[in-house]
Amino acid sequence: MTMNTTVANITNPAVPTSSLHSPHLTEPFRITLIVIYTFVLLVGITGLTLMISLLKTNIRSLTTIAFLNLMVAHFLFLLTVPFRIYYYATQTWNLSSGMCKVVSAMVHIHVYMVFTIYAIILTLRFLHYYKKMQWTEFYRRLHALGASALVWILLLPIMVPLVLNQYGNSDDDAKENQCFKFGKMIENPAVYALNMILSIFIISVSCVQTGIQAIILHAMIRKYGQASRSQQEFWVQIKNLIFVLIMLTCLVPYHLFRLKYLNDTVKLSPANEVFLAITGLTCFDMLTFTGRGVCQVCWT
């Protein structure tokens, strides 16, 4: 009788077993994720507090507007980080599946928003360096704020519903009291192709901008030699280099790994979570630019 019950439990997927609700992350991975996200939260909160001074700078500057949008992206992401820390610590998700989708999707939205803003800032500064663009600020503050709001109005209504609609649609991904297990959706050919295209695009753009930055710095060093450090433009390019380095250390590794992860989501899921958590370290950018005053970050 006992043997028949055991066999029935194994063969009938409707019978709840401990294996159905077993955590998908081992303790070393959970500890790593808790440490990373805790550090991200502390650094992010500190950076946001310090970057408030940015509001006192020239709000019409294109670069300042880009930084303000970067702050908003970090802020929205940081709101969801405590939920991740709690889940990895308790291994239990007690909130709704919809909230799970929001928290899980936000880290991806953060990655793409931060990359987009980085790319815009670097492109603007490259164009300014090569004197391809003279207009660097709006004529009125209201126009600047309107342009900033337009970016979010256009992106969020498209990006958020698309991501939330795709997350967790597969029944195989749904686990009671568990979250962040949406790997099955990648088996959809369209989702797989979209992820591959996005990863390759981000890697390619990052490499191109790294190359351009290296060329600019090399040209300035050859032109001014040891006097380079006395040139204001040189320090602007150094700040650009920091953006590039953050992209190369936080965003590119995740997307390089993702090219492999997309072909083996089950086995590589824990490692993918760690690489995804590392993207949150982009919040460090706010601390980087608050040394001698935020005003020095932006050229006008």
Segments (PLM) and residue ranges:
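Extracellular TM2-ECL1-early TM3 structural module of rhodopsin-like
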Residues: 29-34, 63-65, 69, 73-121
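Intracellular effector-coupling site of seven-transmembrane GPCRs
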Residues: 215-256
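Class A GPCR helix-loop hinge within the 7TM core
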Residues: 111-146
